[in-house]
Amino acid sequence: ALPIFLNDESSSMDEEVFARYFDPENIAYWLAFQLLTGNTDTQSRNVYLYSPQNSDCWYLLDWDNDGMLRRKEREIIQFSDSESWERGVSNYWGNVLFRRCLQTESFRQLLDTAMDELYAYMNQDRIESMLAHYRSVTEEYVWRMPDRLYVPITHEQYEEVLESIWPEIDEDYDYYWESYHNPMPFYIGTPSLQNGVLQLSWDTSYDFNAEDISYTVELARDYQFRQMVYREEHVVLPLTQTAAPAAGQYFIRVRATNTSGYTQDAFDYYVIDSGKVYGVKCFYIQPDGTVVEDTYEE
């Protein structure tokens, strides 16, 4: 019954889903912790779901935090991850439960409160005190074998990472409030080829302030979009078309912009050695005219 309620957009989150299946306060505080620590790989996994015996209610429990508070480390090793739409509430827009929570005003008020309370709790003095304590326990092992083999940074960079922990929490707190101004991410469809015309389409974006949204569509032969094949701005409908290019590898990028000028990438991303290229889908036009989407499995 739960999947039916969640996927039925006419069902009430307050009167049906929250009243029976989930505790909104539990979800709000769980989300607030993930948002403040930048633990982005929690959209649909790395969470423990618990339902007490003889109960229909499910609770989210924190689990697997190995991706949290790593922004400075990724910057040092020049690896692109947890950026773009993965910052702020847009990170959870692709999950039906979280999306419907975020579309519910009463839940957003709960989440605002949870963010403020946890941000106050995770203050600079507390975090720096905890860092000093845990460092005194763990640091001697970090630089010993075999652990030393797996540390991707130097002693000096280790100091930089430690100094960046609380500022990252502070930054993530700001990202939360800013993310409501942006259009929400969306998926790009697999292009189709018909009668010499390449059809390009994508899902519509969503704006919390109900602002009008337009799209910028780009097609290129490379993921850096230096070899541009097609570009169109101010597209209102979630589709466009262009003359079919020759067989080969192509990249499509779509960005949504609202009336206030805030821009969002698509959910899709292309993976290279240095991480994610956000908002980009790769596909191939075969010699026989069929279109094959490039897929990536983690």
Describe the function of each predicted region.
Residues A244-T263:
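Beta-strand-rich modules
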Residues G261-G275:
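Beta-sandwich strand segments
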Residues V229-V236:
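Short beta-strand segments within Ig-like beta-sandwich modules, predominantly Fibronectin type-III
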Residues S51, L219-Y223, A256-N258:
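Residue-level signal for short segments within beta-strands and strand-turn junctions
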Residues L237-A244:
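Exposed aromatic-hydrophobic patches
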Residues L200-W202, V217, I252-V254:
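An aromatic-rich alpha-helical recognition segment common to small helix-rich domains
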Residues P3-Q43, Y50-D212, G279-V280, Y284-E297:
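Middle-to-C-terminal accessory/interaction subdomains
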Residues S205-F225, T263:
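Solvent-exposed loop/turn segments flanking beta-strands in beta-repeat/beta-sandwich domains
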